[in-house]
Design a protein with these regions (language model features):
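Charge-rich, low-complexity N-terminal segments
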Residues: 2-159
Length: 159
């Protein structure tokens, strides 16, 4: 490699770098522009107002990692994530998310029967639990893609 050093051209030995190996990262966000409008309550937090229904504008950031890029030099084919996008919209866009053990679950579902709400039931609620559920869903999508030999990079994983 030729470089200039104080006005003179010099040959400098550069280390060999294998760009085909190592860890590569790529990120994808959902809801980052306006968020998914959903509400939930932490019914076990009886000591605070978090036990009341309250709304959020949820956004999700996924980080993908792989050891080698695919044949297109991608970590992740984001076109293969429509299933996750649909799942996020189904569960978090203009919904009430309730814990399956919420003692008021019947009353929340009654709102849905009256056409006043869309209620989704999760094992648990909260930002951390939602992140865990998204991680699980994305892992399922990736593993299914590997099994079906679809477009997703076979070495990719959610970080």
């Amino acid at each position: 490699m030729n470089i200039f050093k104080w006005g003179k051209r010099e040959k400098v030995k550069t280390p060999e770098i294998d760009f085909g190996k190592g860890k590569f990262l790529s990120t994808k966000t959902y809801g980052n522009d306006r968020g998914f409008s959903c509400c939930f309550r932490q019914w076990k937090a009886t000591h605070s107002h978090c036990s009341l229904l309250h709304g959020y504008s949820l956004g999700f950031k996924l980080v993908f990692e792989c050891d080698s890029l695919d044949e297109r030099n991608w970590v992740m084919d984001f076109g293969g994530l429509k299933e996750l996008k649909n799942w996020l919209e189904h569960n978090f866009d203009h919904t009430i998310v309730a814990a399956k053990d919420d003692p008021k679950l019947g009353e929340l579902k009654a709102l849905e029967k009256k056409g006043l709400a869309v209620v989704r039931v999760f094992d648990n609620v909260g930002s951390e639990k939602f992140a865990e559920e998204v991680f699980k869903q994305m892992t399922i999508i990736i593993e299914r893609s590997k099994y079906q030999k679809k477009a997703l990079n076979p070495t990719v994983r959610v970080k």
